[in-house]
């Protein structure tokens, strides 16, 4: 039994080593580069491929992988929106993901970043760097006085709800697929417009779909309270970045915490020190004191990376042995 793992980072290697010790019957090859047409031939002779990347898995790459005899693909992440689904179906590829590598990791950072915005931490850091120790005018707000609107109440959204409640905030939610327990608590509103109108903070925890592309746009911002806070810890395509800039300029949005950006692949997880970033929209957001950007690191904890490696590799092994996996993704 042989599995090849692509895009293996140095910080993932200890967790792969642990998995290999626990599964001595599996031969594993670790490749640091992303899966591309140039290196897909390395998969020849392997039973499965374990992968992670934001870059698209194109039809060409998937077809070549299938041509090499690899039909079992385990993703070390949640999202499957970068897979060429028609090719997956046509070639009969088995796909698995890691649906819950650490909801708490993402939820915790979303609340942490919001607290920085509410407590004016970026502004005080800027003043302290200049030895300005005055308080005014950067007075803070308390989360316990606010209503938080959670869009998407799955595993991550639910973890965020629990933390927000712990701070004493009122929480309302919206989801096409409602959680029965939350519904009993009367937490849901019926429409996004209701959530926009009531929430002081809006946090996104939904997958990227065609139906929610740029769901936060000029129209959505216009329906929000003045001075709302926006948290995007889901997918970059959920927000129209140019419309967000306009909302920040007008004061409709008081601040934003973003762990993702729709054109992030050219920027995030790269060392660009001393280089010019040509994306003017990104730089506009990046240079604002009331916008906090973290480069897709909400998941990045020891617990999460362990789970990403172990769950994905276990699923690949299940595919090889049985043709099915606990975390198999079905494309209807």
Swiss-Prot record:
Enzyme class: oxidoreductase
Residues engaged in binding NAD(+): 155-156, 175, 206-207, 212, 233-235
Active site residues according to the UniProt entry: 235, 264, 296
MF terms in GO: D-lactate dehydrogenase activity; NAD binding
Recorded catalytic activity of this chain's protein: (R)-lactate + NAD(+) = pyruvate + NADH + H(+)
Assigned EC number: 1.1.1.28
This protein's UniProt keywords: NAD, Oxidoreductase
Keyword Oxidoreductase tagged: yes
InterPro entries, alphabetized: D-isomer_2_OHA_DH_cat_dom (IPR006139), D-isomer_DH_CS (IPR029753), D-isomer_DH_CS1 (IPR029752), D-isomer_DH_NAD-bd (IPR006140), NAD(P)-bd_dom_sf (IPR036291)
One Pfam entry name: 2-Hacid_dh_C
Annotated signal peptide: none
RNA-binding in keyword set: no
PROSITE patterns: D_2_HYDROXYACID_DH_1 (PS00065), D_2_HYDROXYACID_DH_2 (PS00670), D_2_HYDROXYACID_DH_3 (PS00671)
Other remarks in the entry: Also active on D-glycerate.
PANTHER family named among the record's database cross-references: 2-HYDROXYACID DEHYDROGENASE HOMOLOG 1-RELATED
Family: Belongs to the D-isomer specific 2-hydroxyacid dehydrogenase family.
Assembly and binders: Homodimer.
Name the record gives this protein: D-lactate dehydrogenase
């Amino acid at each position: 039994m042989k599995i090849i793992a692509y895009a293996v980072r140095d910080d993932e290697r200890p967790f792969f080593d642990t998995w290999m010790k626990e599964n001595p019957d599996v031969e594993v090859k670790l490749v640091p580069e992303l899966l591309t047409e140039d290196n897909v031939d390395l998969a020849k002779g392997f039973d499965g491929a374990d992968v992670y990347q934001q870059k698209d898995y194109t039809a060409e790459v998937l077809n070549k992988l299938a041509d090499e005899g690899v039909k079992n693909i385990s993703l070390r992440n949640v999202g499957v929106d970068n897979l060429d689904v028609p090719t997956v179906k046509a070639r009969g590829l088995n796909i698995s993901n890691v649906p819950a590598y650490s909801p708490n990791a993402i939820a915790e950072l979303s609340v942490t970043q919001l607290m920085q915005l509410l407590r004016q931490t970026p502004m005080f850091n800027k003043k302290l760097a200049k030895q300005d120790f005055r308080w005014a005018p950067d007075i803070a707000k308390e989360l316990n006085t606010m209503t938080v609107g959670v869009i998407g109440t799955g595993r991550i959204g639910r973890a965020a709800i629990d933390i927000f409640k712990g701070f004493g905030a009122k929480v309302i939610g919206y989801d096409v697929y409602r959680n029965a327990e939350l519904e009993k608590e009367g937490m849901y509103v019926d429409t996004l417009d209701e959530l926009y109108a009531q929430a002081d903070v809006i946090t996104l925890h939904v997958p990227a779909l065609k139906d929610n592309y740029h769901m936060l746009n000029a129209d959505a911002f216009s329906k929000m309270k003045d001075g709302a806070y926006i948290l995007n810890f889901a997918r970059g395509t959920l927000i129209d970045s140019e419309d967000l800039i306009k909302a920040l300029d007008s004061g409709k949005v008081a601040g934003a915490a973003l762990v993702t950006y729709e054109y992030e692949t050219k920027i995030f997880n790269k060392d660009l020190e001393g280089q010019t970033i040509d994306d003017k929209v990104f730089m506009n957001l990046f240079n604002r004191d009331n916008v906090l950007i973290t480069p897709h690191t909400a998941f990045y904890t020891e617990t999460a990376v362990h789970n990403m490696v172990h769950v994905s590799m276990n699923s690949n092994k299940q595919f090889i042995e049985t043709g099915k996996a606990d975390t198999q993704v079905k494309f209807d």
